[in-house]
Amino acid sequence: MFVAAMTESDQNIINLLFSGHYADPFAVLGMHDTASGLEVRALLPDAIDVWVVDAHSGRKVANLQCRDPRGFFASAIPRRKKPFSYRLAVTWPQDTQVIDDPYRFGTLLQELDIWLLAEGRHLRPFETLGAHPSTLDGVVGTCFAVWAPNAQRVSVVGDFNFWDGRRHPMRRRRENGVWELFVPGVGPGQLYKFEIIDCYGNVLVKSDPYAFESQMRPDTASVVSRLPPALPVDEARQHANELQSPISIYEVHLGSWRRHTHNNFWLSYRELADQLVPYVKEMGFTHVELMPVHKHPFDGSWGYQPLGLYAPTRRFGSPDDFRYLVSAFHEAGINVLLDWVSGHFPADSYGLARFDGPALYEYADPKEGYHQDWNTLIYNFDRHEVRNYLAGNALYWTERFGVDGLRVDAVASMIYRDYSRRDGEWVPNYFGGKENLEAIGFLRYTNQMLGQHHAGAVTIAEESTDYAGVTLPPEHGGLGFHYKWNMGWMHDSLAYMQLDPVHRKYHHDLLTFGMLYAYSENFVLPLSHDEVVHGKRSLLDRMPGDVWQKFANLRAYYGFMWAYPGKKLLFMGGEFAQGREWNHDTSLDWHLLDEPEGWHAGVQQLVRDLNHCYRQHPPLYQCDYLHQGFEWVVVDDRENSVFAFIRRDADGNEMLIISNFTPVPRDSYRVGINQPGAWREVLNTDSWHYHGGNLGNQGLVYSETVGSHSRPQSLVLALPPLATLYLVKEA
């Protein structure tokens, strides 16, 4: 192979190209109009011979000279004055190929995209950044783009170039630090990463933050995949998310809901569509909440330490398979909520951590950027590009996968700089306060953006403090969420239920206190996965007493919860009273439903009936967030641990709910009512259908003109032990 002579200046540039320290490869490679005419230059390590081929005629027009034995070729093109489309005929040691030169194509990102990305206001950054199979000038390939403003050089590497960072260095867009390159011949299914020489000279190999598909762990490469098309917004699904609609959520961890019995392996997305969807529908839940399905390296994080926010985990199948699962839920009339982790990410070397050398996606100061509880890094909400990455992801899941809402994880850790930190371990905000003003601004923007551009999608905050206005609109000083988990109600009610009934009269306020703040936010009542792990025990195991009392307590509690103001959430396994804590490595204990005693099957039947009763009776849901929707009747019967209240819909229709939280039956318990006449017992958690004792009122109960509880009319009821009753006024 003949090597042509080079000037010292030319050789320096070539050396920089091969060492990976030349930041503008397009200034050297490709076709250039020089003083001596058109010239083509190519960087092709291991090539033996290179010809320029006219792309239209297919004729060879020039043999490129080898200017460096490492694989740099260049020559003037004789008798050509105007730039033209060309290809390269390359002879390798094993064969000859005709390839398209990535460096003959112009810039990829439009000026408006560049500006919007820099400002953090690009509505759909995922349409611009990442890997996008495309056709340019009739050439099929993939457009790659990645934000790495501190990098000295970025190359795209993959199967298509032997993972060799010398072969495809990218163009730097100095306006905003994005690197871009169109690589001909690369298509869906091919693996890739970005090789980055950071500002310190270190070579890093990173997965694509915007990858739509990734390899199954422990492999870490991104996969070229087409952007899923946008899905239409369904009016019925929008209505199902509204404040005045019934919302009963089944929280699911896809990897442990059910597994293959012969090898304990996960069900796929499509198998879940066949098994989980009909089960949720039969059980009467209106919504399903999927614990995070983003790419995450560690099974034990349950998805809450994601490293690929735009890629559904490959544990259960492809992105198309996940879309199939979401569609199956929708066809069954079930809305899909997705747990969304926008506060922190793990520090795995191939991920976002120190992406191009210094802290980029995370805060640089560990007092701001390191989460001690979870050993993770905290997103730098002060950077426009980081906020854009996250906000765009929220729209991506709702718009491209049809997800109906996002449950935002660990909001308190985002909005407070001193979250889980002692004095001296956190950095105050600009005004000296503890609030993370940038994170608050991000949440407000994201909630507003979703409301404007994906009507009907809801956001739910897991916020564990008393921060005011979580569900108020941003224009009124709030964060803009639609709903907030009621952690206070959950803690108080479980604390009450764990007490031996003989002691409950001394803690009566645990069940009444919640109504003092029930209308301060739009609350969801959560019995989530967090309540059945880390030694807290299962819900059933937390109930006091013998077997009969444990199940009766749990049934009475569920009855109370389903009637209490607020939307409902129950973690999988709770619907049939799983006896042990949740284990993400195994299936739920479905065999319990086959036990001859029938305790677990009884609870499952109760939850099914509670859901259907809840959906059929507007007083139980229509005015959850209006004072008119709830009225205490019996609030102070500490001695008997009895609670009674009215639920009311917008038309004034009423339901009476009464709970007896002692194991003592109350045979003639008088309860005041507003509306005289016949009242029908429509649900009794002590029914034999639920494996209870079947004490109750056997259908209709007629009012008496006897005053009680400051009301002129009353009912005399038989209250079963450890039970909740629902009664409806007959028309």
Curated annotation (Swiss-Prot):
Q: Which CDD domains match?
A: AmyAc_Glg_BE (cd11322), E_set_GBE_prok_N (cd02855)
The record's temperature-dependence note reads:
Optimum temperature is 30 degrees Celsius.
**pH behavior:** Optimum pH is 7.
Q: Which family does it belong to?
A: Belongs to the glycosyl hydrolase 13 family. GlgB subfamily.
Q: In which pathway does it act?
A: Glycan biosynthesis; glycogen biosynthesis
One BP annotation, GO: glycogen biosynthetic process
The protein here is known as 1,4-alpha-glucan branching enzyme GlgB
**What is the purpose of this protein?**
Catalyzes the formation of the alpha-1,6-glucosidic linkages in glycogen by scission of a 1,4-alpha-linked oligosaccharide from growing alpha-1,4-glucan chains and the subsequent attachment of the oligosaccharide to the alpha-1,6 position.
Tell me one GO molecular function of this protein: 1,4-alpha-glucan branching enzyme activity
Assembly with partners or alone: Monomer.
Q: Name one GO cellular component term.
A: cytosol
The record places the active site at 409, 462
Keywords assigned = Carbohydrate metabolism, Glycogen biosynthesis, Glycogen metabolism, Glycosyltransferase, Transferase
Which Gene3D superfamilies does the protein's record reference? Glycosidases, Golgi alpha-mannosidase II, Immunoglobulins
Q: For this protein, what is the EC number?
A: 2.4.1.18
Q: Please report the organism this UniProt entry assigns to the protein.
A: Dickeya chrysanthemi (Pectobacterium chrysanthemi)
Matching InterPro entries: A-amylase/branching_C, Branching_enzy, GlgB, GlgB_N, GlgB_N_E_set_prok, Glyco_hydro_13_cat_dom, Glyco_hydro_13_N, Glyco_hydro_b
